[in-house]
């Protein structure tokens, strides 16, 4: 399986898990020059921007640990653009940033993993 196919597989797995948890799927793989948003979901009135990470094992800290500060900043920039295209911003629109981490066969959903602050 190619790297891209692997990413799509785990993004679909995350999407279905989150849908079963009650979130509503809105978009996937939204890409801008500054970054990419793996999944955009809706949880009631809140927009949820989801970073999906997969690691085969926890040797270097696992999937959740791979969401570095610079990765968070790229996701924040992409979400800022996405919101602006809809005449919205973090100050006026309920949003959160979740991480869906898959390490080996272990799934970990981290709601509100980091902030736009």
Curated annotation (Swiss-Prot):
- Molecular function terms, GO-annotated: nucleic acid binding
Matching entries from Gene3D superfamilies are given as: 3.40.1350.10
Q: Could you name the domain of life of the organism this protein comes from?
A: Bacteria
Family in the record: Belongs to the UPF0102 family.
Q: Which PANTHER family match?
A: UPF0102 PROTEIN YRAN
The protein here is known as UPF0102 protein YE3728
Tell me the organism: Yersinia enterocolitica serotype O:8 / biotype 1B (strain NCTC 13174 / 8081)
